[in-house]
Structures are given as structure tokens and as C-alpha cells.
């Protein structure tokens, strides 16, 4: 199958890890350029060493590169503010976009839940690291029961939280909570992120609580385990920390939730950990690794969809 040429905008930790993942192999994408703004960037140096064309002149430099005309899709690993400007330029030139920032111009995308298969969409958003790790589980429960409320807690090492994450905690929680509802299928979603200062650094840990209608527990468990297997196909370090737990609440003992009210039904608790692949980032940076792995998977799906549309 023919491959679509792609560019990575942003040569920091996220962009560099994504570069390594793409260079390790893709059936759909061929890395044609890495873009940064710092001529001394380690990411740009690593790209050059591996034979990938680079520019340190940002989006303007990319547009001037001879490879630009053949690039069909770009991964943006910069900032929400920068992404809006990048998208305007690339949309004008008919390029597809995978947005790893909180800009959320395009629809939220979680590869095992809503892969990018709509040929009318050209810009997709990868939500947040917490969303990529937890929304598949909310969706798994939603597949077998109506989920009234879902709450996730993402705990990540302080070392793996860069300045962008620290400056946008509120945006992280809002974006993740919204995607818990729109992609995960919960009527109401809530998200919490914890920056863990422990040394040595701990790998990413996630807790997911769902409150759903009463349903057979085996159906929920089977759906959750099947979803975990799907995520593991592109994030091998994604795993269940302990058995899925259940608790039933009847009319004689309803659960009281601040801001929600009383709940009767099934509470499902899922505890996960995410270990990074160590491609460029440390193994404890599972929160960053799941973002780059998901972006690669979603980008491949988006590229394949548009190539099939063009060939039709």
C-alpha cells in the first residue's frame, strides 16, 4: 500500500518520541520532515542524524521546504495557541492534521473507540494523556450499560509533566471531562490529574469509576478486558493493575455524589498503569508515551481513510 508523507511540528519530547515511533515503522505513513524553532534542539539533531529533513524556522520554514508539496498530514506537538495558526495555514493547503495540543479544533479521537474513519474530517484532536488512558474504559462500560456518571483520576510523575501540562491543568480537566461524555458515552464526566513528586519516578496510574444502570457484571468485565487488549495493540505497557471491582447500590442505600445527586445502580472501578515503551522518553513517562502511540495510530487511520477516498 502507498504511504502518505507526514511532518512533525514540534521537536520537543513529544515530537521526538513520535518521530522515533514513526521511524520504527508504519504501513501508512512516511516521515518527511521535522519542524522546530530552536536550531540547537536535540530533537532536530536526532532527526538529521536519521536522515529526516528538518527546519528550525517553524511553520514558515516547513512551507518553504521542497518536501512540503508532497506532505499530506502533519502532527502538531506544539501548543494550543500555535496550533490554531498552524491549522489555518495547513487547511489552506489541503493538509490533514493530528493535533496533540489542547486546541481541540477537530473532533476528539481515541483510536480503539472512534478511529478517524470519517473522510470529511481533516483535523483530529488527541484529547489528553489522561483521556487516552481512561476513556477507552468508560467506553467499554458504555458498550454494555448506560453510564450515568464517570470519574477518572490520572496520576503521573512530576518529572514527566512539562511546563505545558503544568500551565494547563484546568484545560486538561475540562478537555478530558468533555471527551468522557462525547467519546466515552457517559452522561456526566469528571477528570482529576495528580502530579506525583515521588522519587524514583512512578509510572502513570489511572483510576476509573463508572456509575451505570444495573447490568451483569461479567458483561462489564469482559468488555473492559477486550478494550484493554485493543489499547495494548499499540501501547504494550497498558495494563490492569488489579481485578475489576463492582459495588451495587439499591434504593435502600443510594450513593450520594456531590453535584450529581443520589445514584442507584452498578459502580465499576478499574485500576490501570501505563508504562512507556522507552523509545525516547523514560519508561515512567507512560502518560506521554500513550499520547504519541495514540497519535501514530490515529494518524495512520486518518491517512488510510483519505488515501482510500482519493483512490475511489
From Swiss-Prot:
<feature type="binding site">
    <location>
        <begin position="160"/>
        <end position="168"/>
    </location>
    <ligand>
        <name>NAD(+)</name>
    </ligand>
</feature>
<dbReference type="GO" id="GO:0009056">
    <property type="term" value="P:catabolic process"/>
</dbReference>
<protein>
    <recommendedName>
        <fullName>Acetaldehyde dehydrogenase 2</fullName>
        <ecNumber>1.2.1.10</ecNumber>
    </recommendedName>
</protein>
<dbReference type="GO" id="GO:0008774">
    <property type="term" value="F:acetaldehyde dehydrogenase (acetylating) activity"/>
</dbReference>
<dbReference type="Pfam" id="PF09290">
    <property type="entry name" value="AcetDehyd-dimer"/>
</dbReference>
<keyword id="KW-0560">Oxidoreductase</keyword>
<feature type="binding site">
    <location>
        <begin position="11"/>
        <end position="14"/>
    </location>
    <ligand>
        <name>NAD(+)</name>
    </ligand>
</feature>
<dbReference type="InterPro" id="IPR036291">
    <property type="entry name" value="NAD(P)-bd_dom_sf"/>
</dbReference>
<dbReference type="InterPro" id="IPR015426">
    <property type="entry name" value="Acetylaldehyde_DH_C"/>
</dbReference>
<dbReference type="GO" id="GO:0051287">
    <property type="term" value="F:NAD binding"/>
</dbReference>
<dbReference type="InterPro" id="IPR003361">
    <property type="entry name" value="Acetaldehyde_dehydrogenase"/>
</dbReference>
<feature type="binding site">
    <location>
        <position position="287"/>
    </location>
    <ligand>
        <name>NAD(+)</name>
    </ligand>
</feature>
<comment type="similarity">
    <text>Belongs to the acetaldehyde dehydrogenase family.</text>
</comment>
<keyword id="KW-0520">NAD</keyword>
<feature type="active site" description="Acyl-thioester intermediate">
    <location>
        <position position="129"/>
    </location>
</feature>
<keyword id="KW-0614">Plasmid</keyword>
<dbReference type="InterPro" id="IPR000534">
    <property type="entry name" value="Semialdehyde_DH_NAD-bd"/>
</dbReference>
<keyword id="KW-0058">Aromatic hydrocarbons catabolism</keyword>
